[in-house]
A protein has these predicted regions:
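Conserved acidic
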Residues: 1-12, 18-469
Length: 469
């Protein structure tokens, strides 16, 4: 894939829609506009068809404005990406609930307007979160270059973040820590392979080089945390013991060796060309996160965290949804044929990025960074762990802080009870009531989910910490 610097963009006004039952409020650059009744909602939407339109929450709420039979939803991997209105050029994107922590629709609109103005300075037009993330990166490039490697091999070594938990247990004196700006920091830290070439299986697996290898690995059964992911089904990851086979990055296989695993490489690929295309981008992102308002800065953070996944996108599992009723209760999906995306041969970039974060989680979060003894985590989630407070002593002073790439202390927990990855509750030294945490939910929603699942669910089990402490 040839990556080119961003060219000229077409700019349109941005508008935030707040849909209700047969009502619509639109926050526009020229003021707030309102409509009541299905016909009036349609007319208002049509008048805004030359705007970039967004909702803060779910796109499906738009069905309530005019009736669902007038809308069409674009789907990708089971998620609605955009919705369009019949007889108009209206196309609506979602802000993916990024601003849910901020009160008031007007405040959310002003935050997005601030983001749009900041992007304008870089020549980036508003669009979907993914499109803005991609074009912001391209705006920081000063020359064209190539990213291209065998898509099958790249995808075989592409795994997601590590998520594990010990459900149904209560622990005392624990601490939640995470790596600040883990993904963008690792993207900018060292070079990637522009493309790779096959080399001898006996080639040393240098952890700082962005290589890939197919290997057979023996993970000792007494190792507390398996270092390498394998696939269980299409989406789930497993952390298995004994003999496993697969493709991983050099960095991840080197980490496995350091923990005592036996690695037998059958095929190996090393960088033929190297590129470091994210340094300027990371400078721009950090500037935006530091200078914009908290709400707008959170949107910039979302853009920066979305970029790496673009390199692993595929054009399969696509479709459109129509509704045959006015209430949105009778959806019909039409599957669309798979198409080849330009990013289909850049999966090695996504694979290397996620691997870098997993290796740090493994060698610093799950195991002690000083001597590789177990840190005994009870909760692992992508770029953060919850570990005994005592384990923090193995981190040196330079590793802990609020700078990008450092381990940040989020919460000191007097008591914690875990149900699943991204689902737990805790008390601090200064609180007497439980604080509930669940990904993408309010505290009240998290509490309800927590109480509905007393034994936990769908988890990858960690060793029982009460038996290892």
């Amino acid at each position: 894939m040839q990556i080119k610097p961003l060219g000229r963009s077409r700019f349109k006004p941005v508008t935030l829609l707040v849909p209700k039952w047969r009502e619509l409020v639109a926050y526009t650059p020229s003021g707030i506009k309102k409509a009541k009744g299905a016909g009036a909602c349609y007319d208002l939407l049509k008048s805004l068809e030359m705007h970039n339109l967004y909702v803060s929450h779910t796109l499906k709420d738009l069905l309530n404005t005019t009736g669902s039979h007038m809308w069409q939803a674009e789907m990708w991997k089971g998620h609605v990406t955009t919705m369009s209105l019949d007889g108009t050029k209206v196309k609506v994107h979602s802000l993916r609930r990024i601003l849910d922590d901020f009160d008031g629709d007007e405040q959310k609109y002003l935050a997005f307007l601030e983001l749009a103005e900041w992007l304008h300075d870089w020549g980036v037009a508003p669009g979907s979160i993914s499109a803005m993330a991609w074009n912001l990166w391209r705006s920081t490039l000063d020359q064209e270059f190539s990213l291209s490697f065998n898509s099958q091999i790249g995808r075989q070594s592409f795994y997601g973040g590590r998520q594990e938990a010990t459900p149904g247990q209560t622990y005392s004196d624990f601490i939640a820590v995470d790596i600040s700006s883990a993904y963008p920091y690792e993207m900018a830290r060292r070079p990637y392979a522009g493309t790779l070439r096959e080399v001898s299986p006996r080639t040393p697996l240098e952890p700082e080089i962005a290589g890939i290898a197919q290997a057979r690995v023996f993970v000792p059964n007494d190792l507390p945390h398996s270092p390498l992911p394998t696939r269980s089904g299409n989406e789930s990851l497993a952390w298995s013991k004994g003999w496993i086979e697969g493709s991983w990055t050099w960095s991840e296989l080197s980490a496995a060796k350091s923990l005592g695993c036996k690695v037998e490489v059958s095929r190996c690929w090393a960088p033929l060309t190297e590129v470091q295309p994210f340094e300027k981008w990371w400078e721009v992102v950090r500037e935006g996160r530091a200078t914009l308002s908290p709400a707008a800065a959170k949107l910039v953070k979302s853009l920066s965290n979305s970029l790496w996944g673009m390199f692993g996108m595929t054009g399969d599992d696509r479709g459109v949804v129509r509704w045959t009723d006015q209430l949105g209760n009778s959806p019909e999906m039409v599957q669309k044929r798979s198409k080849s995306l330009p990013q289909s041969n850049t999966a090695h970039i996504a694979a290397e990025t996620t691997s870098r974060v997993r290796v740090r989680m493994l060698l610093e979060g799950l195991y002690s960074p000083s001597d590789l003894s177990p840190n005994n985590p009870v909760h692992v989630d992508t770029d953060g762990v919850i570990i005994p407070r005592e384990a923090l002593k193995s981190f040196n002073e330079m590793m802990i802080g609020n700078k990008s790439g450092q381990w940040r202390i989020k919460t000191v927990m007097k008591v914690i009870e875990v149900r699943a990855p991204q689902l737990y509750r805790y008390k601090t030294e200064t609180t007497t009531t439980w604080q509930y945490v669940a990904s993408g939910m309010t505290g009240k929603q998290a509490e309800e989910l927590f109480k509905r699942n007393p034994q936990g669910f769908g988890v990858s089990l960690l060793p029982n910490v009460s038996q290892t402490l």
